[in-house]
């Protein structure tokens, strides 16, 4: 454990950030899973609505640096292609 006051403060801040980031990452994954589930139902309207919500969340996480921009693009393009296939 840290002995210097500033190091203790940094440890506390780091733990707080870790917990917040974990929460945000979990929320993002939930939106992605909901979108995959909506695509699996085969209803294009529902899937499209879920995709729009997921896209907002993924873009926000990428802009904040929680995930890489390319990872966000991969999620969006993969799901967009699946939604496009739906009749």
From Swiss-Prot:
GO CC terms in record: cytosol; small ribosomal subunit
UniProt-annotated stretches for the region Disordered: 1-27
Record Gene3D superfamilies: Ribosomal protein S20
Biased composition regions of type Basic residues, renumbered to the chain: 1-11
InterPro entries per the UniProt record, alphabetical: Ribosomal_bS20 (IPR002583), Ribosomal_bS20_sf (IPR036510)
Keywords, in A-Z order: Ribonucleoprotein, Ribosomal protein, RNA-binding, rRNA-binding
A molecular function (GO) term: small ribosomal subunit rRNA binding
Annotated GO biological process: translation
Cysteines engaged in disulfide bonds, as pairs: none
Family the UniProt entry places it in: Belongs to the bacterial ribosomal protein bS20 family.
Function: Binds directly to 16S ribosomal RNA.
HAMAP family: Ribosomal_bS20
The protein's name in its UniProt record: Small ribosomal subunit protein bS20
Organism: Histophilus somni (strain 2336)
The organism's taxonomic lineage, starting at the top: Bacteria, Pseudomonadati, Pseudomonadota, Gammaproteobacteria, Pasteurellales
